[in-house]
Swiss-Prot record:
Gene Ontology BP term (one): translation
NCBIfam families named in the record: rpsB_bact (TIGR01011)
Domain of life, source organism: Bacteria
Organism annotation: Actinobacillus succinogenes (strain ATCC 55618 / DSM 22257 / CCUG 43843 / 130Z)
Protein's recorded name: Small ribosomal subunit protein uS2
GO molecular-function terms, A-Z: structural constituent of ribosome
Entries under Gene3D superfamilies matching the protein: Glucose-6-phosphate isomerase like protein, domain 1, Helix hairpin bin
Keyword Ribonucleoprotein set for record: yes
Length: 241
């Protein structure tokens, strides 16, 4: 079972919140106190909440659910992509385009355009174009890949989103809320836990903390997928007998 320990969280600096003057009073239940003008997250609250969230991610993956990892701030961007790829899930790590979930129909058309351009770049179509046309299409493809590359194979809305930084990704959270998609989020002391189904109180800026959250989440998803695949194989064997 994918879990994190208190020691791992301390080593990663999960307990370091923001300066006290930037705090959100709604995070009071999760704050241990302050040190040198910085709020300290109560890891005794975070630990069970995080492990509960991991268990739920495993359950969703076990039911063949799709998880969308969201983290567009610089400190999270590359790690978000790596974690999603590692557990064969989906990600948005550059910029959240308004309507990415709530206007999925339009997003799907943009994904189709991206895939068409990818095909054209590989089947020789680009070579038949003028230099300018080929360059324009290459630029369009690169732009679409940056925005939609992590969700181009998602084929429909996700079953949950895992967010690094509730405050920073509030638009993504609002869209998920509107559609009834469960939200898992790292919530720092300057953010609001409102509208987050699985609150994980902790530092959302430190690279080591972000890496810890994502590694654990990816492990939980892989565990669920492995169990689901084992069940599928068992059914296939029984059907073949």
């Amino acid at each position: 079972m994918a879990q994190v320990s208190m020691r791992e969280m301390i080593n990663a600096g999960v307990h370091f919140g923001h300066q006290t003057r930037y705090w959100n009073p709604k995070m009071k239940p999760f704050i241990f106190g302050a040190r040198n003008g910085v709020h300290i997250v109560n890891l005794e609250k975070t630990l069970p909440l995080f492990n509960e969230a991991l268990a739920e991610l495993t359950r969703i993956a076990n039911n063949n659910g799709k998880i969308l990892f969201v983290g567009t701030k610089r400190a999270a961007s590359e790690a978000v992509k790596a974690a999603a790829v590692d557990c064969q899930q989906f990600y948005v790590n550059h910029r959240w385009l308004g309507g990415m979930l709530t206007n999925w129909k339009t997003v799907r058309q943009s994904i189709k355009r991206l895939k068409d351009l990818e095909t054209q770049s590989q089947d020789g179509t680009f070579e038949k174009l003028t230099k300018k046309e080929a360059l324009d299409r290459s630029r369009e493809m690169a732009k679409l890949e940056l925005s939609l590359g992590g969700i181009k194979d998602m084929a429909g809305l996700p079953d949950a989103i895992f967010v690094i930084g509730a405050d920073y990704e509030h638009i993504a959270i609002k869209e998920a809320n509107n559609l009834g998609i469960p939200v898992f989020a790292i919530v720092d002391t300057n953010s609001s836990p409102d509208n987050v189904d699985f609150v994980i109180p902790g530092n959302d800026d430190a690279t080591r903390a972000i890496q810890l959250y994502l590694t654990a989440a990816a492990a939980a998803v892989k565990e669920g997928r492995k169990a689901e695949q084992a069940v599928e194989e068992k059914f296939s064997e029984e059907a073949a007998e």
